[in-house]
């Protein structure tokens, strides 16, 4: 009986420690960008797929605080979903694709493949981020969260 109680106590302690680990892995400042685009005239579906993989790989390699990245078919449009750890991670992405940034060439190619129709931003974006994106001249729409969670 004593061994059984010891075992149950041990399991209880371990489960509490695991619970704390999962709480620590929440990302409370995550931002999600949903970019609606059209493929540019003259670009085949195969070219779009190949470039999408190329660009996704470049982001994965160069931006450790980009939590996720994916291009998706949406009828005659393309949806790009970008997930960022926080405002700073997104602003770093903006700097990376800007003139002189490590992804400048890739972004020029991006704009050769796609026309951006709108960018919906989900999460609590700071005023600093909202000001940062203005010079890009793209149609950003910000949507603050009422309630959300994101795991690490």
For the regions a language model picked out, list residue spans one by one.
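Mid-chain, well-packed structural core segment of small domains
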Residues: 92, 98-110
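Short S/T/G/P-rich N-terminal loop/turn motif that feeds into the first structured element of a domain
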Residues: 16-78, 85-95, 112-152
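Sec-dependent N-terminal signal peptides
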Residues: 4-13
